[in-house]
């Protein structure tokens, strides 16, 4: 768990009952994918990577729950900490060098790896990947 810099904290709030339930299940069954949602879209036209990244950074900047991290250890009651920015939530992988026949399998494997990479609620519960 990364120590938070107070200058990066926008707000600290109590958990809602729904968030308490999510944290309960997260701690009780750490290998569960109960709250994991993965969406995969195929875009047939060119994607301007910098614009894609800028757009997602904007989405995260105006949706504080996407910048939320949980803290429950060493505090009286679990807390939700809203960060000013969410670092490293974007991942870009260029798969264009893969043979066309292998590309779908390669991307499917990347999606499987992403699904297997469990979220640490202390670090955030949101990420975006772009496979070109």
What are these regions (language model features)?
Residues 5-84, 97-132:
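Acyl-group handoff/entry surfaces in thioester-processing enzymes
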Residues 91-92, 104:
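Short, charged, solvent-exposed linker or helix-capping segments at domain edges/interfaces
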Residues 85-91:
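Short, charged/polar, Gly/Pro-enriched secondary-structure boundary elements
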């Amino acid at each position: 768990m990364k120590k938070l810099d107070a200058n990066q904290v926008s707000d600290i709030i109590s958990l809602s009952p729904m968030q308490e339930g999510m944290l309960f299940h997260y701690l009780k069954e750490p290998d569960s994918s109960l709250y994991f949602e993965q969406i995969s879209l195929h875009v047939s036209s060119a994607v301007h990577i910098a614009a894609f990244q800028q757009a997602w950074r904007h989405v995260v900047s105006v949706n504080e729950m996407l910048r939320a991290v949980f803290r429950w250890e060493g505090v009286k009651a679990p807390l939700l900490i809203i960060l000013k920015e969410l670092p490293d939530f974007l991942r870009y992988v260029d798969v264009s060098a893969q043979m066309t026949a292998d590309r779908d399998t390669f991307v499917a494997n990347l999606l499987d790896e992403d699904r297997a990479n469990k979220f640490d609620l202390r670090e955030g519960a949101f990420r975006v990947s772009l496979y070109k």
